[in-house]
């Protein structure tokens, strides 16, 4: 099964991402966001950028994570490469990644939405369904 698949959505974009762990779910979702947006990046920097987020629950944390990536793309024209999860609980996320300048974006995402957000674990496979406002 591929790590993500686009889902038909009338007004926005939606995707379902699958991974063998909750940590991998967050990194695969970042990849899905970049690929669906058509992000082309320069080679990654040797620098490390750390991001720390907190939320009330795992679904909110997941949406905050994707919106942080959207913010970095929009404001700084940066994407993260080689993302590693340093800490992940139901309410806390700490990641490290190498920032890369974005050469081009095919289509900008305004935000990841809470519409239909769902994270599940079945038979050792984690899945999340996300709707993006474009």
Regions flagged by a language model, labelled:
Residues 1-134:
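Intrinsically disordered, low-complexity regions
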